[in-house]
Regions:
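Walker A/P-loop nucleotide-binding motif
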Residues: 42-66
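Conserved NTP-binding/hydrolysis module of P-loop NTPases
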Residues: 9-14, 87-106
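Short regulatory helix/loop adjacent to the ATP-binding pocket of P-loop NTPases
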Residues: 65-68, 175-190
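Conserved AAA+ ATPase "SRH/arginine-finger" region at the nucleotide-binding site
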Residues: 82-85, 178-179, 190-204
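AAA+/P-loop NTPase substrate/partner-engagement loops
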Residues: 69-98
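Conserved AAA+ ATPase "sensor/coupling" helix adjacent to the nucleotide-binding pocket
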Residues: 98-100, 173, 198-218
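A short, basic N-terminal segment
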Residues: 1-43, 279-283
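C-terminal alpha-helical "lid" subdomain
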Residues: 2, 177, 184, 212-283
């Protein structure tokens, strides 16, 4: 039997999979989503969200997709790229035509042909059908220079009032200096936002939220003592991925040791083991 079933939970509360249902929305996350929705609604073009590893960027992207699909299913065409490992312009453009479900007559279309097809797609849907076309790229720091140049060119397509492509780039901190390389791309960013780690109180709220989401009746079982949460925050520094992994280990230890609550000594023991393992691997 799974450990969470033993604790009376319906689902795994601390899975590292980017499930939007388990995404705790901090005040900052809510602010980012609100500003992105406004930027999309106003069709301002390019928006960027950056953050260190483990700050919840991918889950935020999935949450935005979920919100847009629910609120604007008939008016928004939402496309997402999760791992943009395309080295060449033609390769990237060909993938975009597939993503946008654009039919191409030629068996081996050139980059120019692909770009023309995408241009037609943007004007047909963005102007004639009055749709909002959104392209969200996660792990955007992986974009090659030719891909960034392609995106810069796609942002050129506009009416007198708005951009035809709403581009959201989400990535690690090194994304920002890379956006300065293609000419005029940096100046086109309408929204720049950096995700920070959670505070101590938000760490506690995140833990309780995920337990509530995993419970059978929607209540939040109290399994973590305050001292344990203090240690979790001090060790993870508020990074959601680290919080999730440590809480997962803590609940497994809770069941294996037949304890009632996760307390400070239990968490400290887990942290000590993790630290020794890292030191051993580094040696």
């Amino acid at each position: 039997m799974s450990y969470f079933k033993i604790l009376g939970l319906e689902k795994e509360p601390f899975s590292t999979s980017p499930d939007p249902a388990f995404f705790y929305l901090s005040k900052e996350h809510k602010a980012i989503l609100y500003k992105l929705k406004i930027a999309i609604r106003l069709k301002r073009g390019l928006s960027t969200v950056v953050g260190n590893v483990g700050t919840g960027k991918t889950t935020l992207a999935r949450r935005l997709f979920q919100i847009l699909r629910k609120e604007n299913e008939e008016t928004v065409l939402f496309h997402m790229i999760l791992n943009p490992v395309y080295r060449f312009e033609r390769e990237f453009l060909l993938y975009l035509t597939q993503l946008f479900q654009i039919e191409i007559d030629s068996k081996w279309p050139s980059a120019i042909e692909c770009m023309k097809k995408i241009e037609d797609y943007l004007f047909r849907n963005g102007v004639e059908k009055n749709k909002t076309i959104v392209l969200l790229i996660d792990e955007a720091q992986k974009l090659s220079v030719p891909c960034l140049e392609t995106l810069r060119m796609l942002l050129n397509y506009e009416t007198n009032e708005y951009k035809l492509l709403q581009l959201i780039l989400i990535g690690q901190m090194e994304l920002l200096p890379r956006l300065r390389k293609p000419e005029n791309l940096w100046d086109r960013i309408s929204l720049k936002y950096s995700i920070n780690p959670l505070g101590r109180d938000e760490t506690e709220e995140m833990i309780n939220f995920r337990l509530k989401q995993a419970s059978r009746n929607g209540s939040s079982p109290i399994l973590f003592e305050d001292g344990a949460i203090d240690e979790i925050y001090n060790y993870t520094q508020g990074y959601p991925r680290k919080i999730t992994m440590l809480c997962h280990d803590a609940l497994e230890a809770l069941v294996m040791e037949s304890r009632e609550f996760v307390d400070r000594p239990l968490v400290c023991n887990l942290i000590s083991k993790a630290t020794k393992l890292v030191e051993t691997e580094a040696a």
